[in-house]
Amino acid sequence: MSDDRTWMLRALRLATLSLGRTWPNPGVGAVVVKDGRLLGQGRHAVYGQAHAEVNALGHCRAQGLDPAGATVYVTLAPCTRHGKQPPCVAALVAALGDPNQDEAADLLAAAGIAYEEGCLEELATRLHGGFLSRVAVGRPRFTGKWAMTLDGSLATGELDSAWISSLPALASSRRRRRVFDGIVSGSGTAFHDDPSLLSAQVGERTPVRIVLSSRAELKDGSMLVATRAKAPVLVVHGAQAPADNLAALRSHAIELLAVADPHDPLQVAQALGQYGFNELLVEGGAHIHGAFLRAGLYDRLELYTGFATLGGGLPVCSGLGVATIAEGQRWEAEGPPRLLGETVALRLRRPRPVGAADQEPVVVIG
């Protein structure tokens, strides 16, 4: 691996520590290198705070090291717009371009700074895919997650699903929540299962809990309401939701987002993109998974298969309108399967274009 790729891979791994913490901004990582030596590193850790390259250069100076003449490796081109932060283009850069603006190269060149894009571009695109999706098509990147039996059931015919997955798998899946901006659930799951959708450990960051409810309803004594102080709750509702329901949710400090047709996943996706979400995990039942699969909204899947059979349980989804195997949606593995007790965990993604080169994997926490 070339030196450039080595340092960029370090920046990418650093950026994974910011997953779920910086939306609507991407969680960028940066390292400062001079004469083959690491001088400093930094990341955009929280929305509204310093950007990655600012923190990396500050790390150099805090150690009494002069970054003059160094190369800054960033996972996304530096910001050149005034917003929460001033322009931060004061160092050499090699990175993926920022889709929000294209003047970075000109500004850097005018300042006498060499600029190069494309080092580990595919990995940077994969890491920042949610942000890139929101900028390009107006919606977040969605990951569908479910636990199922060996014969593809989410639950028994009586809707019992506790627990298909092993305890190690449950703990792993809950830890994974923290790398997303939000967790999406349907109203049926919210009523029947009454999940808290919190992360695995006390004090650990939990994303925004998002419930799709056309009538803006949550169960009386809901765990989501009871745990509101631990993480925000957002209810996506229809434009004609009863005023009393909206008032009741507001009284519990529940955030509200109206869409014209909450049963249309494409409208929901656009609304959540406008809200600022980059990466969303969908945890729900057959109805919501079927709707998102039919709409082609899932970019990734995280599947947990428990070693049980039900024979006639509730299927993962239905109504995809597929008549032949060739018409089915195809996926490719994103890393090897993992054995978690009596459960196999598998991460999938939409297939890459034919001929796309394999690159070193980014280590994602979780």
Predicted regions, residues:
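Enzymes that bind and transform nitrogen-containing heteroaromatic metabolites
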Residues: 1-26, 60, 141-143, 148-366
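Short charge-dense sequence patches
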Residues: 1-12, 38-43, 71-72, 119-128, ...
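A broad detector of the eukaryotic-type serine/threonine protein kinase catalytic domain
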Residues: 16, 43, 94-97, 113, ...
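Contiguous mid-protein beta-loop-alpha structural module that forms a pocket-lining wall or clamp
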Residues: 97-151, 167
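Helix-turn-helix
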Residues: 29
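Zn2+-dependent cytidine deaminase-like catalytic core
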Residues: 32-123, 208, 234, 239-241, ...
